[in-house]
Regions:
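Short-chain dehydrogenase/reductase
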Residues: 1-4, 36-40, 63-64, 95
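Short, function-defining helix-loop hinge/capping sites that tune catalysis or transport
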Residues: 8, 30-33, 98, 145
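Flexible, glycine-rich beta-alpha linker
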Residues: 16-37
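C-terminal substrate-binding subdomain of Rossmann-fold SDR/epimerase-dehydratase oxidoreductases
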Residues: 46-167
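Residues in and immediately flanking transmembrane alpha helices
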Residues: 13, 35-38, 79, 164
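Active-site Tyr-X1-5-Lys
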Residues: 1-22, 43-48
Length: 167
């Protein structure tokens, strides 16, 4: 939020037009599969025919927004947003637990024979998110007329297929 504060300060002090977007778990073709985000790890596992090994109980809830939808939202905010305002960009219709996401991704590519493996997470040292649910309030950007179009199955299928074509 420090960047947002600096931008709004420039708006107020120098009248520099500023609009702020807050992307929520945006994914799609071209994303780095080694960036440490759980869904990037899951995609890399499927692309490389590896089982998905859960590093937590998978109960954290997240909403995912396909890159093409997010890009349209970014431009809409740039062109029609109010200076100094922040707009959440996400897909509140695509909220899913991390465990259910792993199972869903595996089910999209049954021919790969990949499965979800759960560990006993009682004694495991993993970075646990302090946020158990992260679903954006989309009211402000919806008021600009933006609604994401891509469902989670379609978006992740396209994303994984894009990496399959590269390999």
């Amino acid at each position: 939020r420090m960047g947002e504060t600096i931008c709004v300060s420039w708006l107020k002090q120098y009248n520099i037009p500023v609009k702020i977007v807050r992307p929520f778990h945006t994914y799609g073709p071209g994303m780095a599969l080694d960036d440490g985000r759980v869904y990037a790890d899951f995609i890399a596992d499927i692309v490389n025919n590896r089982d998905i090994v859960m590093q937590s109980d998978g109960s954290a809830m997240r909403s995912f927004c396909y890159l093409a939808d997010a890009t349209i939202a970014f431009f809409l905010v740039l062109l029609n947003g109010i200076n100094g305002e922040a707009y959440n960009v996400g897909n509140s219709d695509c909220e899913i637990s991390i465990l259910n996401l792993a199972n869903k991704l595996v089910s999209l590519f049954p021919e790969k024979g990949v499965k979800v493996v759960t560990k006993n997470t009682q004694n495991i040292n993993y970075l646990k998110s302090a946020v158990s649910r992260n679903c954006p309030d989309m009211t402000k950007i919806n008021n600009l007329g933006w609604y994401p179009k891509t469902k989670i199955n379609e978006g992740f299928y396209k994303t994984i297929n894009s990496y399959e074509k590269i390999l």
